[in-house]
């Protein structure tokens, strides 16, 4: 059980406007990037291989392949630089952390899709 005072302080800081997702989902993370005076949106699309849940310290890691090289990026869920998270596809997984996906490419990296009716 967590400290009640800590929960009371963290509750207003949690973001509720983002889509709910879990490990094994394919997501698009829309990031706000500031370059000098300008601001633009950059999209990072990939598979969620890790999600650690702990209030305001909640983090998730997304992995994708770019030009044949595996790229991983870790995001804080409650970060103001994340403008939107889109869930593209939900997959059936039995693990909370999918680090075994780092060794797989091509057909061996496929996951079974959960179809919604």
Swiss-Prot record:
<dbReference type="GO" id="GO:0006412">
    <property type="term" value="P:translation"/>
</dbReference>
<dbReference type="Pfam" id="PF01245">
    <property type="entry name" value="Ribosomal_L19"/>
</dbReference>
<comment type="function">
    <text>This protein is located at the 30S-50S ribosomal subunit interface and may play a role in the structure and function of the aminoacyl-tRNA binding site.</text>
</comment>
<comment type="similarity">
    <text>Belongs to the bacterial ribosomal protein bL19 family.</text>
</comment>
<dbReference type="GO" id="GO:0003735">
    <property type="term" value="F:structural constituent of ribosome"/>
</dbReference>
<keyword id="KW-0687">Ribonucleoprotein</keyword>
<keyword id="KW-0689">Ribosomal protein</keyword>
<dbReference type="GO" id="GO:0022625">
    <property type="term" value="C:cytosolic large ribosomal subunit"/>
</dbReference>
<dbReference type="InterPro" id="IPR018257">
    <property type="entry name" value="Ribosomal_bL19_CS"/>
</dbReference>
<dbReference type="InterPro" id="IPR038657">
    <property type="entry name" value="Ribosomal_bL19_sf"/>
</dbReference>
<dbReference type="InterPro" id="IPR008991">
    <property type="entry name" value="Translation_prot_SH3-like_sf"/>
</dbReference>
<protein>
    <recommendedName>
        <fullName>Large ribosomal subunit protein bL19</fullName>
    </recommendedName>
</protein>
<dbReference type="InterPro" id="IPR001857">
    <property type="entry name" value="Ribosomal_bL19"/>
</dbReference>
